[in-house]
Amino acid sequence: GNPDLTWERARKTNVGLDFNMFSSRLSVQTDFFHEYRDNILANRSTEPVIIGATLPAYNLGSMRNMGFELDVTWRDKIGQVNYWLRGNCSFARNTVLFRDEVPKQFDYQMETGRRYGQFFGLIFDGYYNSWDEINALDRPVSAWNGNQLQPGDCKYVDVNKDGKIDNYDMVPMGYSNVPEI
């Protein structure tokens, strides 16, 4: 255990606006929020593990989260029937401000500065259609599957231009696993 652990801290700012229109038949509620969190409990990645044991967690992460919420309601009456319709939506985007991570060879591989849960992967560049494409001298060498490619296999972009398709070519892609809407 780590005797220096503390509670995670959060600083939040919310600004809301509620209003009614058309004799209170239409009501709208909006909230804009900004949250900064630090002392997030996380494992260290920059200290070597010599004996194979997991190191204790530390309070060392920080993150920003911001967005809005919108709620719209329509209340009315047709004859003797009262009805209401309601819709809501929200949008939130987070950014990892600090994560204890080993410096990567290329900045595009860092998780700090990206959304929490960001996926990384290779950029698809079509398929190998013939043996001539596979046997071309200028084709990047694949670090996987012993570089044994066949027509129909996927082609990937050599992002760092080192002549190899490997983990150094993985870039942030798509959305994170944390929904925004």
What are these regions (language model features)?
Residues 77-176:
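Conserved small-residue
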Residues 180-181:
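C-terminal substrate/ligand-recognition segments
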Residues 1-121:
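Extracellular/periplasmic, surface-exposed regions of secreted and cell-surface proteins
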Residues 37-38, 175-177:
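A short local loop/turn or secondary-structure capping micro-motif enriched for an aromatic residue
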